[in-house]
Amino acid sequence: MASETEKLLCLNTESAEIPADFVELLPPDNIGDIEAVSLETSVGQTIEVYGDVGVDWAHGSQYHSPVIALQPLVGSSLSSRDHDKEMFVVQTREEEVVGYQDSDNLLFSPEFGSQMVLPVNEDDYLQPTTASFTGFLAAENGQGELSPYEGNLCGLTTFIEAGAEESVNADLGDKQWEQKQIDGLDGEFPFTMWDDVNEKEDPIAEEQAGESPPDYSEYMTGKKFPPEGIPGIDLSDPKQLAEFTSMRPKKPKGDFPRPIACSHKGCEKMFKDNSAMRKHLHIHGPRVHVCAECGKAFVESSKLKRHQLVHTGEKPYQCTFEGCGRRFSLDFNLRTHVRIHTGDKPFVCPFDACNKKFAQSTNLKSHILTHVKNKNDQ
């Protein structure tokens, strides 16, 4: 495949015709070695010819670009009268053979966006063209567009850079990204990942979702119901009443920091270290341990073994108070039983003007039903 390297020579004239003595234009033989040469024109203007050293975009090597650049016209600014002048652009082409085997792939690489270089007619080695000076300035200022289809490759670099920038912007889209640090477990290094800012949840919604449910257990230990009752809870519903009376007071947290969050989605619990977090993760696991007698499933095998004591009738837990000796299958039942001996009645009726206390939550639940029934009958 052959590519075209162009040489431009721009002549400013006052008339719209090429001078008669301008018959043939030959490029200098060693233009790459020329740093700056002053030329005298017929109108007394001085122009300079530069040898531009750049990088060959096809081969990836340096080369001396055969581009002839002209000095600006007389005057720092152009008047409206100068804009109407016409400028002759004489383009000379020098053919060189490109031996790069993947040149086709390079020309149509995504780095160049939607731009494409078309081959030109090899017979047209000299093409005089005319262009309006106003249009030329507009193209240089970005208001116009130099089309590669017109045979002008001077703006090829600009097209390539613009196409590459548009390609990158198209890949990024409108999304915004930020780096997020993820802490690893013991023996693992923390790693960084990219997080989409647009897909972040609303901080207010996260805060509301992370809020723990109200602690109603205090109504079981002495706090009285408000006159309007508890919003959202109907104690006349047996299911809601059972959930209400089964609430346990939350254990007070220690003063030590808890920087490790549970990795399970929807769990807001925090832990002091990774080992505590891994131990907690078991409750989120599948309940693969199923009781053969009743079908109740458990996460841990130890919980299943403890449950099976109910079916086997084994009662390893015995009351130690003198003269009692009762035995129980579960330690929880033993702790509840001990309150009978100690006289501890932690469960207090939450209704106003009623101060009855109970040793077991089930007894308090039955007592609350009497209040609800009497209130509905009134």
From Swiss-Prot:
Query: Cellular component per GO?
Result: nucleus
Q: Which domain of life is it from?
A: Eukaryota
Family indicated by similarity? Belongs to the YY transcription factor family.
Gene3D superfamilies (UniProt xref): Classic Zinc Finger
Where is the stretch described as Mediates transcriptional repression?
243-378
Q: Which UniProt keywords apply?
A: Activator, DNA-binding, Metal-binding, Nucleus, Repeat, Repressor, Transcription, Transcription regulation, Zinc, Zinc-finger
- The molecule here is called Transcription factor YY2
NAD in keyword set: no
Protein localization: Nucleus
**Mediates transcriptional activation as annotated region, ranges:** 39-113
Whether 4Fe-4S counts among this entry's keywords is no
Gene Ontology molecular functions? cis-regulatory region sequence-specific DNA binding; zinc ion binding
Q: Which organism is it from?
A: Mus musculus (Mouse)
**Which one Pfam family would you cite for this protein?**
zf-C2H2
Print the miscellaneous field: The gene encoding this protein appears to have arisen by retrotransposition of the YY1 gene in placental mammals. It is encoded by a single exon found in an intron of the gene Mbtps2.
Q: What does this protein do?
A: Functions as a multifunctional transcription factor that may exhibit positive and negative control on a large number of genes. May antagonize YY1 and function in development and differentiation.
Tissue-specificity statement: Weakly expressed by neuronal and glial cells in the cerebral cortex. Expressed by Purkinje cells and in the granular layers of the cerebellum. Expressed in all layers of spermatocytes in testis but not detected in sperm cells.
